[in-house]
A protein has these predicted regions:
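Conserved core segment of the aminotransferase class I/II
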Residues: 123, 300-369
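Conserved core of the PLP fold type I
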Residues: 137-272, 284-285, 290-301, 371, ...
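N-terminal basic, amphipathic alpha-helical segments
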Residues: 1-128, 309, 333, 337-344, ...
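Amphipathic, non-transmembrane alpha-helical secondary structure
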Residues: 8, 12, 181, 185, ...
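N-terminal small-domain helix-loop-helix segment of the aminotransferase-like
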Residues: 83-175, 182, 356, 424, ...
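Hydrophobic residues in well-ordered beta-strands that form the structural core
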Residues: 196, 217, 276-278, 351, ...
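Conserved glycine-rich beta-strand-loop-beta hairpin in the small C-terminal domain of fold type I
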Residues: 369-379, 390-404
Length: 468
């Protein structure tokens, strides 16, 4: 442990033991130099670390003070993704998926949008059409990197945002999760360090365990996203190889990074030679006028692997995703050949047929409008029926709300009780191996709203009220 970490740990222990109370002023940097015998730079780094972890706050012209509620946000710590921890996460995920298959359960825990939102009849017609005209060569033509017309169509979508990506850089995959996993394999070896958000998409934690990678969690703000100061401290301390990050409509929190933050993020990762694996599956589900740019838009050094899919915005059942892989494209193709061999040829051809009709953008406009309306309606119902002590964190994109229960309530326990009433919610610890998010849960707003959903929220409010 480095000297500044030792000092930070000492001060954390003093705060935890009550030596320093919330609101107390800490010794100034110069006084701490005299007290500790350490250099000014070491003391400064220690204070910066404590500030990034939420233990202390800096006040201009006044100094450093113990935070009112240390610690609000998760600190930058190692998450050892051990088998036991992964089993706990997998249990939550298994229970959630099982519940989503039961039509009697109101699926507020689901990760998927309502399938009735998608143009399934048109897509099925496209699938039937290509099945009639497919030849024996179709399978060969659609081997990695995938159907050339589909890759060209995806490249044109990038071009609409001013991002130049050659179809040759794009690899078609079996959904975004395969794109993300292959990207991770392409830039890491077992034992390497990978940064993940906290909380993060649970598939990231499962992937790290499977590939025997070490996870590093960095503080993430519910509204603003990644703490860049905490990120830089982590990059200084650990030999990080990759960063798995959602930049737009993050799951489960829902935030979208600002363009300024994306620029700084790409520059910082480039400085430390860290590859960004950008998970951008929700990018089409924005509610504003313009689609938010991915971090890939500012990639000038081929340091961003941009992964997305059609699963959340067009057709979940087809399992078609892609990665804009740049210089890693050939390696990812080889890795894909050794695992899944290729992505479904009929599904690729059906998507090419559908995209050629120019109906896609009209569908997306309709989808965004419906999701925004459903999110607003769900939010209003939650405000009506849930106790005032419950905080609802709302973002203007996607279809998730992030709810915060008051202490000492536990979302995991609430989710189990709710299931007995045929209501599912996704507890926060699904998205982290620690206990930082045990009072939080994710709420899916994408399903058609009716009397059943209204009564389910009302019942959820009663269950929470009983535990206050």
């Amino acid at each position: 442990m480095k000297k500044y970490q030792q000092l930070a740990e000492q001060l954390r222990e003093q705060i935890a033991s009550g030596i320093w109370q919330p609101g107390d002023r800490l010794p100034s940097l110069r006084d701490q130099v005299a007290l500790s015998g350490m250099s000014f730079m070491t003391v400064s780094h220690a204070y910066q670390l404590l500030e990034s972890q939420g233990y202390i706050i800096a006040r201009p012209q006044s100094g450093y003070y113990v935070a009112p509620q240390a610690i609000k946000m998760p600190k930058a710590t190692v998450i050892p993704v051990t088998r036991d921890e992964a089993v706990d996460i997998n249990t939550y995920i298994f229970d959630m998926l099982q519940a989503s298959r039961d039509p009697s359960v109101v699926p507020f825990a689901s990760a998927f949008p309502d399938p009735r939102l998608f143009p399934l009849q048109q897509l099925n017609r496209s699938l039937a059409q290509v099945s009639k005209t497919a030849t024996a060569m179709s399978v060969i033509e659609n081997l990695p990197p995938g159907n050339v017309e589909l890759r060209q169509a995806i490249a044109r979508r990038y071009a609409l945002q001013g991002i130049t990506i050659s179809p040759d850089e794009i690899v078609i995959t079996a959904g975004a999760l395969e794109a993300l996993n292959l990207s991770l394999q392409a830039v890491t070896e077992p034992g390497d360090w990978v940064i993940v958000e906290n909380p993060c998409f649970y598939g990231a934690l499962q992937a790290l365990e499977r590939l025997r990678l070490k996870a590093l969690s960095v503080a993430t703000d519910i509204k603003e996203g990644i703490d860049l100061q905490a990120l830089e401290l982590a990059l200084q301390e650990y030999p990080v190889k990759a960063y798995w990050l959602m930049t737009n409509s993050q799951n489960p929190l829902g935030f979208t990074l600002t363009p300024q933050k994306k620029v700084r993020l790409v520059a910082l990762l480039n400085q430390y030679n860290v590859t960004l694996i950008e998970d951008d599956v929700y990018s089409e589900l924005y509610f504003g006028r313009e689609k938010p740019l991915p971090a890939k838009a500012w990639d000038r050094h081929d340091g961003v692997l941009h992964c997305s899919s059609f699963s959340k915005c067009l057709v979940p059942g087809f399992r078609i995703g892609w990665v804009a892989a740049g210089k890693h494209a050939r390696k990812i193709q080889r890795l894909q050949l050794m695992s899944t061999l290729s992505t479904s040829s009929p599904m690729q051809l059906a998507l090419v047929d559908y995209l050629s009709t120019r109906r896609y953008d009209a569908h997306l406009r309709r989808l965004r409008r419906q999701l925004a309306e459903r999110k607003q309606r769900a939010w209003q119902a939650l405000l009506r029926y849930l106790p005032a002590e419950v905080k609802i964190h709302h973002n203007d994109s996607g279809y998730f709300l992030w709810l915060e229960l008051p202490e000492p309530l536990d979302a995991g326990e609430l989710s189990l009780v709710a299931l007995t009433h045929h209501i599912s919610i996704a507890p926060g610890n699904m998205f982290s191996t620690g206990e930082n998010w045990s009072r939080f849960f994710r709420f899916n707003t994408a399903w058609q709203w009716g009397e059943r959903e209204e009564q389910a929220v009302k019942q959820l409010g009663k269950l929470i009220q009983e535990r206050l």
